[in-house]
Amino acid sequence: MAENLKKLAQSESFLSLQDKVCFWANDYQTNSCDQNLNCCIELIEQVAKVQAQLFAILTATAQEGGHNEGVETIKSRLLPLLQTSFSSLGVGKIIQTEIRPIQDFQLRSKNRQSSLDQEQQQSDGDSFIESQPTQVQDDLTESGKNLEGTKNGSAISLLAAEEEINQLKKQLKSLQAQEDARHKTSENRRAEISRTDRRPSGKRNSERPQDVVSNYEKHLKNLKDEIAVLSAEKSGLQASHRQTRSRSPSPGPRGPRGPRGRRRSRSHSRSHSRSHSRSHSHSNSHSNSRSNSPCTTVAKIRSPSPNRSKMSSVARKAALLSRFSDAYSQARLDAQCLLRRCIDRAETVQRIIYIATVEAFHIAKMAFRHFKIRVRKMLTPSHVGSNDFETAVSDYIVCHLDLYDSQSSVNDVIRAMNVNPKISFPPEVDFCLLTDFIQEICCIAFAMQSLEPPLDIAFGADGEVFNEAKYRRSYDSDFTAPLVFYHVWPALMENDCVIMKGEAVTKRGAFWTTVRPVMRCRSRSLSPICPRSRFGISTVSRSRSPSPIRCTFARY
């Protein structure tokens, strides 16, 4: 191939091709048409000779490359050129003569590739056949291991079953021995009973009817007490109904205190009749009946229905939570309206209501403890040796929650508020304005102590870290302040879980700037009747004496 290439490089036709093209280009304008055509044909003939030599060199080069080399180059570059560039017959003959070796080379390469593929498939099949026995052997060993493990597991389970059978046999023997001993003891008891039956048993026969009669008498006494309570309730309701029907409306304009005084007179008559009937029916068990002062105001009196004990704890809890929520949303706002007529500062009003709520819970819990002690003393003689004594005490308390002396608790709360240094204000204002609110909170707190577990309010102190789990900030708070300035409403807790969130006011730096030395507060004497004007402002000056400084933290 190298010799042919050297001959082509030194051939006259290849060397004179460039010179002829240059001469033709220079003489093209002066030559005639025939002369130009002759020049062009001469160049084509010379180029054809060069191409024939190049194809010979191409064939030799492809043969030197072997079966696989140069195939892609010929396919991608030479074949498209041959299809588009040469259309004349003479050139076609030359191409056919030169292309045949290339086609033979392509055919040989295809045959070679197919033979290589067949050899590869055959080698793969031989390797699979060789690896199949080893795979079968591995499967056999694995199945043998599984069989051995199953055998060991079955042996272990068999041993466990045998051990369990032995234990059951031992238990059966012990039970048989116990049964034999029981039969022997029963036979001995029968023999003793038969011996004792021969003795006179008049005394024993006389004791049994006495026990039955005493039980019937206790049951009859309880029924009579319930009947007396219900009859007193009925008579009180009938009397109040007759009074309301006999009372005619006045033609003139009524004063602002008319409806409130009328409601208080009705509640006073009802409470008086109920307390009188209960003191009559429970004279043996209750030594002190409820006091009925002229200023007694009962916010919500619940009838002592016998079905009260049957009410589930969940239903009572839901009702009390609803009452507590109503007290926050309605009764608290009413109390604020009353106090705002006398006090300008909203902070002082909210502090007064919060302290009243805390004191009411504290006093109600103390009253519940004393009430439970009295119930225990009363029920002890009739439940001696019984296992359900605590259940009986709880049922009695739930059934007789209306025996709670709420007015006495209201008086105690007002006394505690009078000596609290945080809410000292001018003497023209009296805490008797909050009697209805305090009485409602006391009744709610007293009833919450009868739940299982009881509900209580969370401890709160000014300056404590704000807890989002217990309180929500009021609308006028600084939402970036970390400390509580003062509390608006306490949080309701069940053990350590928050049932209802309270409300607190947070202000950054306000707690330290408003701290002032604690002054001695002036105690307020509490009279049964609170003289007030239209808005609860006292028109009669009352004597006040200095009292010692008390701890300002909330009591629980």
UniProtKB/Swiss-Prot annotation:
Query: In UniProt terms, what function does this protein have?
Result: Key regulator of mitochondrial quality that mediates the repairing or degradation of unhealthy mitochondria in response to mitochondrial damage. Mediator of mitochondrial protein catabolic process (also named MALM) by mediating the degradation of damaged proteins inside mitochondria by promoting the accumulation in the mitochondrial matrix of hydrolases that are characteristic of the lysosomal lumen.
Protein name in UniProt: Mitochondria-eating protein
One Gene Ontology MF term: cardiolipin binding
- The annotated region (Disordered) lies at 110-150, 171-214, 234-313
A single cellular component GO annotation:
cytoplasm
Keywords assigned by UniProt, alphabetized = Coiled coil, Cytoplasm, Developmental protein, Lipid-binding, Membrane, Mitochondrion, Mitochondrion outer membrane, Phosphoprotein
Compositionally biased region (Polar residues): 129-138
Question: Compositional bias (Basic and acidic residues) spans?
Answer: 179-214
Keyword Coiled coil on entry: yes
For the biological process aspect of GO, one term held by this record is: mitochondrial protein catabolic process
Bias class Basic residues marks the residues at: 257-283
Annotated region described as Interaction with YWHAG/14-3-3 protein gamma, given as residue ranges: 1-290
Self-association state and partner proteins as the record states: Interacts (via coiled-coil domains) with BNIP3L (via BH3 domain). Interacts (via coiled-coil domains) with BNIP3 (via BH3 domain). Interacts with YWHAG/14-3-3 protein gamma; a protein that also plays a role in MALM.
The answer, when asked if Transmembrane is one of the entry's keywords, is: no
Q: Which residues form a coiled coil?
A: 152-184, 210-243
Location (main, coarse): cytoplasm
Organism field: Rattus norvegicus
